[in-house]
Design a protein with these regions (language model features):
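Cap/lid segment of the alpha/beta-hydrolase catalytic domain
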Residues: 86-101, 116-150, 342, 398-403
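Gly/Ser-rich "nucleophile elbow"/oxyanion-hole loop immediately N-terminal to the catalytic nucleophile
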Residues: 73-74, 139-154, 158-187, 202-208, ...
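The feature captures the conserved acid-bearing segment of alpha/beta-hydrolase catalytic domains
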Residues: 215-331
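Glycine-rich nucleophile elbow surrounding the catalytic serine of serine-hydrolase chemistry
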Residues: 185-195
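Active-site-adjacent alpha-helix of alpha/beta-hydrolase-fold enzymes
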Residues: 97-103, 112, 278-379
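Bacterial Sec-dependent N-terminal signal peptides
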Residues: 1-27
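N-terminal cap/lid segment of alpha/beta-hydrolase-fold proteins
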Residues: 24-76
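Short beta-strand element of the alpha/beta-hydrolase
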Residues: 73-86
Length: 431
């Protein structure tokens, strides 16, 4: 899978002529403002958040460059995937977890001001992270998480197909270049983006670690069977399956994406990466407690922590991608900017990998760091908790929990990390 680099470069060059004073499109913010079309329904599918499948509208906010005439009639699309641990914000015990998060909104706006169209999409939630049943708790945690990831990949693919369908039959309302679709995943969204790019064979989800050893019929989990039941859920693209487990959306259109960026997150297994997969960039805290930077186990942060499944993080993923030649399109570009120089000083020669080293967590060195590009407000978190039926103290707890792995959190600090993301990622997409 390879993006149309020549076409993107030519389009970017024409745009640059229109904005010579301001800078080069995609590399700098050449548009003064952003137009947001909120809550566009891109698909409908069954969510199991309450335990009973419910058909739900899945929505996205679409960010477009504005404030100046746009000479491009077909613009690259970024599908943005927010964080949240597959549990709704506040319910998940944190101050983040929706497409309205400060970091998600800011990153989408910055991409749009550079000339991309950005779809900031919701996806289906729901798993059982805290099940501690001594007999089958591990299988329930692992199985329900894998099903959550699987459903979210189906949702992201439905979103991609929505835009290709719109371009084909609806006069391309958002002026999308159907040959240039990119995924950018933050935190949990990083899991979605990475696994979207590599999962394509049923055999990949029947590895021994993805087979249940116990029965949990309430969850559709049975000993000796894969956690993911494709006969019920449909295939990786969300095609097939049965109600009330899957609802097909926009069949017949391509799911192809041309580039993948993960800000944290992980991949289910290194064997899933193959030659020809989309180019990948990984930006990852080296001491991330939620998604290992290298090879490790995903844990639920309870007391004591509950193991879920072993995965690989950006440190291993980008190494494999480079070894297979998937990042050849930018691997030898010879970037000499300060962001590249910093990344290259600590990434063991793995171009496209930016390890984030922040020193010891001052609250507790064992906690590590996660999401330094995020910021949140105590009062807003309290108000959101109240709006969801909780006491304000629930907001206090969520705010405090988020600070544990982002102890120096503030807007200026977060924006500095977002600046790093933009200046590392965009030259590699455009090259």
């Amino acid at each position: 899978m390879r993006r149309n680099l020549r076409k993107l470069a030519v389009l970017g060059m024409f745009s640059m002529f229109a904005y010579t004073v301001q800078g080069q499109r995609f590399l700098t913010e050449v548009f003064p403002s952003v137009n947001v079309t909120p809550s566009v329904i891109y698909s409908q599918n069954y969510e199991v958040l309450t335990g009973t499948p419910v058909l739900k509208d899945l929505k996205m906010d679409i960010y477009e460059p504005s404030g100046a005439a746009d000479p491009m009639t077909e613009r690259p699309l970024i599908i943005y995937l927010h964080t949240g641990s597959y549990i709704p914000i506040i319910v998940n015990g944190n101050a983040t977890g929706s497409r309205n998060d400060s970091a998600a909104v800011e990153i989408c706006k910055q991409f749009a001001r550079r000339g991309y169209v950005v779809a900031n999409m919701d996806y289906r939630l729901g798993w059982d992270p805290t099940n501690t049943n001594p007999t089958n708790g591990l299988d329930i945690r692992r199985g329900t998480l894998l099903n959550a990831v699987y459903r979210s990949i189906q949702d992201a693919k439905a979103c991609v197909r929505y835009f290709r369908k719109d371009a084909a039959i609806n006069n391309n309302v958002y002026k999308i270049d159907v040959n240039n679709f990119y995924l950018v995943g933050q935190g949990t969204g990083g899991y979605i983006a990475l696994n979207y790019a590599v999962l394509n064979s049923p055999s990949e989800i029947t590895l021994p670690k993805f087979i249940s050893s116990t029965d949990a019929p309430t969850y559709g989990i049975f000993a000796g069977q894969p956690y993911v039941n494709q006969a019920a859920l449909g295939d990786f693209d969300g095609i097939g399956g049965v109600a009330p487990f899957n609802n097909e959306n926009h069949p017949g259109y391509s799911n192809a994406v041309q580039f993948v960026v993960n800000l944290g997150g992980a991949m289910g297994d290194s064997s899933w990466i193959a030659a020809g997969d989309a180019p990948m960039i990984g930006i990852h805290c080296v001491d991330d407690p939620f998604a290992p930077y290298g090879v490790g186990i995903v844990y639920v942060p309870t007391t004591p922590p509950q193991a879920v499944v072993d995965v690989i993080g950006s440190g291993e993923i980008i190494k494999h991608a480079n070894q297979l030649g998937n990042n050849a399109c930018f691997a030898n570009a010879g970037f000499t900017d300060p962001y590249t120089l910093r990344a290259n000083s600590i990434n063991n020669g793995n171009e496209g990998l930016f390890p984030l080293q922040q020193g010891l967590n001052p609250v507790n060195p064992q906690l590590g760091h996660a999401g330094p590009w995020e910021w949140y407000n105590l009062t807003a978190t309290q108000n959101l908790a109240v709006a969801m039926g909780y006491l304000p103290t629930r907001g206090d707890t969520c705010y405090g929990n988020s600070l544990l792995t982002n102890p120096t959190m503030n807007k200026a600090y977060a924006l500095a990390y977002i600046d790093t993301i933009m200046n590392y990622v965009n030259p590699r997409i455009v090259f």
